[in-house]
Amino acid sequence: MMRHDRNVTEIDAETRPDENLWHSGDSAVGAPPAATPAAMTDLPEDRYLNRELSWLDFNARVLALADDNSLPLLERAKFLAIFASNLDEFYMVRVAGLKRRDEMGLSVRSADGLTPRKQLALIGEHTQRIATRHARVFLDSVRPALAEEGIHIVTWADLDQAERDELSTYFTEQVFPVLTPLAVDPAHPFPFVSGLSLNLAVMVRQTEDGGQHFARVKVPNNVDRFVELAAPRAGAEGENRGVVRFLPMEELIAAFLPLLFPGMEIVEHHAFRITRNADMEVEEDRDEDLLQALERELARRRFGPPVRLEIADDMTEGMLELLLRELDVHPGDVIEVPGLLDLSSLWQIYDLDRPALKDPAFVPDTHPAFADRESPKSIFATLREGDVLVHHPYDSFSTSVQRFIQQAAADPNVLAIKQTLYRTSGDSPIVRALIEAAEAGKQAVALVEIKARFDEQANIRWARALEQAGVHVVYGLVGLKTHCKTCLVVRREGSAIRRYCHIGTGNYNSKTARLYEDVGLLTAAPDIGADLTDLFNSLTGYSRKVSYRNLLVAPHGIRTGIIERVEREIAAHRERGQGRIRLKMNALVDEQVINSLYRASQAGVRVEVVVRGICALRPGVQGYSENIFVRSILGRFLEHSRIIHFRNINEFWIGSADMMHRNLDRRVEVLAQVKDPKLTAQLDELFESALDPSTRCWELGPDGQWTPSPQEGHTVRDHQVSLMERHRSP
């Protein structure tokens, strides 16, 4: 998995070197070396961008895809849904955390100098702008375009009498029985409103005395949001073939409110939705049983305080004041939306069987290293010949990483499988393989991170299933999330023991592996096998190893390891020039890492960052970041891999860690060095494609604004399409 108007400023030519010069050849890479460290200027206080506003900018880039007429129509609807889901989670976690700090009087400023209260105010203003734009893209662009393709999302007023009669029957039989109108009066307190539920706020009037009363009707979340009409309107023969019409469920309920309140006059009704704090706090050091502690906290999460109130823009002031008072919501937390609330429901429309309105189907290929071998031990034989780098979704996950684990479970010579699981799919073949391994008498160890946000219930369920099958289940280290993506297979080969490993950037999830871009290293290298053995001993036992042979491991080693390599790249650049650092990641926030990149820029090292989401680094500022260039690539696949390259010291690293405080200080993360020249060449090609001047992307300017690139009139290539074509070519 996931924020604004394109009112952006072009970067001044004086502050940005010629892009073709910087990109094209080795001889042009790296500015002239700074003479000495003394030549570096002090770093200014305003060198960081706000991480929360940067995240909103990321979601605005997602919204820009929904507004892109060149994309297939249902893909645009999908991006509208993704935007909405992203924003929900942002409020449940990030905004909730800021509000908690503000309410507790913890006015610790952000790296860019803002108090929690100031950040909340800016977030509210920014969210209102992009939420309005989100609604307008749907109302003014996507919805009419869907109608042109025969997919109509209609209102009750659009229906003819036959359609209304049809829906009357449907409502009476399917919807009315599950509705519970909740009145508010001295005998009925204001009802609890669950987070992310869609509701109707209804004002009714008694016909006898004219007294008005409030009632709340929850739109059921266990039925489709959009009700499909069974038959199209009458018309010429063939005219309506392929036409479908949908009515939002809240419109259907609103039309039949008199049935819910017989004898009452319906004065007004409006849709609303609240978001609640879902940021859990589990006191691990005080709870012996982490599983029970987490389950208690999950039960409490649904009752978290409100952090956002979304309302339809037709809501009256009186109704809004009532909701603010009864829900205890601050006026600054209200987001007013034209049209429909909760467009995450557009996934239902995306799921329509209309392939012409979606991206062409893409079937991942089996990696060439595994394509021609069919014996049960084929992957082990391949890895004995050399390391393999897989790039998902272009290389199939199921015929590489998944098969590696499945073959290990079935191989009688395999003695042990040790695996980390952060987020896995509902019918996970990885989990099944671990269960089969345990049932076959192998030592199977699963480190299940039950604190993976919003996957806690699923992970608890799988942890118990694994335990019942005899798998040794561990929940990680107290106070840390285990986010690394590692698997260790121990195999007897003759009189020797050999270890086979996988270290990746993405989760062991066969479903998301078709949608997320990730890389992974499969290897039988003894030093990596020894490192993973030490790592799993740390995770399952009382070992506290902090240094490794060929890995960087957080929370002790990644930040210092990266900064130390930046300093080595600077030193090498001073000796011979050609300094270049390339980073690809989901987020760049950690101030110490950012400062090290500023120092590299001041020394003349070229720094290129490809970041999907948050970036707190301010590029292109003369004196400290003029040699830093930041771009963001979004597309049909979620760019998820983390890769770092230091040119002069000739090191490539891949792994699970983004450059964020939580990854470097509060998680177990792993970066592995890729050494095989054939594999580093693959990573180099990936960087060259992502950084090509003609690649469609957004570029970050020194003012914090993101600008679409290339500009109109220039050649444009799609990074992901290019990779799909490359993987399919013979």
Swiss-Prot record:
<dbReference type="Pfam" id="PF17941">
    <property type="entry name" value="PP_kinase_C_1"/>
</dbReference>
<dbReference type="GO" id="GO:0006799">
    <property type="term" value="P:polyphosphate biosynthetic process"/>
</dbReference>
<feature type="binding site">
    <location>
        <position position="640"/>
    </location>
    <ligand>
        <name>ATP</name>
    </ligand>
</feature>
<dbReference type="InterPro" id="IPR025200">
    <property type="entry name" value="PPK_C_dom2"/>
</dbReference>
<feature type="region of interest" description="Disordered">
    <location>
        <begin position="1"/>
        <end position="39"/>
    </location>
</feature>
<dbReference type="Pfam" id="PF02503">
    <property type="entry name" value="PP_kinase"/>
</dbReference>
<keyword id="KW-0547">Nucleotide-binding</keyword>
<feature type="binding site">
    <location>
        <position position="516"/>
    </location>
    <ligand>
        <name>ATP</name>
    </ligand>
</feature>
<dbReference type="InterPro" id="IPR025198">
    <property type="entry name" value="PPK_N_dom"/>
</dbReference>
<keyword id="KW-0460">Magnesium</keyword>
<feature type="binding site">
    <location>
        <position position="453"/>
    </location>
    <ligand>
        <name>Mg(2+)</name>
    </ligand>
</feature>
<comment type="similarity">
    <text>Belongs to the polyphosphate kinase 1 (PPK1) family.</text>
</comment>
<dbReference type="Pfam" id="PF13090">
    <property type="entry name" value="PP_kinase_C"/>
</dbReference>
<comment type="function">
    <text>Catalyzes the reversible transfer of the terminal phosphate of ATP to form a long-chain polyphosphate (polyP).</text>
</comment>
<keyword id="KW-0597">Phosphoprotein</keyword>
<dbReference type="InterPro" id="IPR036832">
    <property type="entry name" value="PPK_N_dom_sf"/>
</dbReference>
<dbReference type="GO" id="GO:0008976">
    <property type="term" value="F:polyphosphate kinase activity"/>
</dbReference>
<dbReference type="GO" id="GO:0005524">
    <property type="term" value="F:ATP binding"/>
</dbReference>
<keyword id="KW-0808">Transferase</keyword>
<dbReference type="InterPro" id="IPR024953">
    <property type="entry name" value="PP_kinase_middle"/>
</dbReference>
<keyword id="KW-0067">ATP-binding</keyword>
<feature type="binding site">
    <location>
        <position position="612"/>
    </location>
    <ligand>
        <name>ATP</name>
    </ligand>
</feature>
<feature type="compositionally biased region" description="Basic and acidic residues">
    <location>
        <begin position="1"/>
        <end position="21"/>
    </location>
</feature>
<dbReference type="GO" id="GO:0009358">
    <property type="term" value="C:polyphosphate kinase complex"/>
</dbReference>
<keyword id="KW-0418">Kinase</keyword>
<feature type="active site" description="Phosphohistidine intermediate">
    <location>
        <position position="483"/>
    </location>
</feature>
<feature type="binding site">
    <location>
        <position position="423"/>
    </location>
    <ligand>
        <name>Mg(2+)</name>
    </ligand>
</feature>
<keyword id="KW-0479">Metal-binding</keyword>
<dbReference type="GO" id="GO:0046872">
    <property type="term" value="F:metal ion binding"/>
</dbReference>
<dbReference type="InterPro" id="IPR036830">
    <property type="entry name" value="PP_kinase_middle_dom_sf"/>
</dbReference>
<dbReference type="Pfam" id="PF13089">
    <property type="entry name" value="PP_kinase_N"/>
</dbReference>
<feature type="binding site">
    <location>
        <position position="86"/>
    </location>
    <ligand>
        <name>ATP</name>
    </ligand>
</feature>
<dbReference type="InterPro" id="IPR003414">
    <property type="entry name" value="PP_kinase"/>
</dbReference>
<dbReference type="InterPro" id="IPR041108">
    <property type="entry name" value="PP_kinase_C_1"/>
</dbReference>
<protein>
    <recommendedName>
        <fullName>Polyphosphate kinase</fullName>
        <ecNumber>2.7.4.1</ecNumber>
    </recommendedName>
</protein>
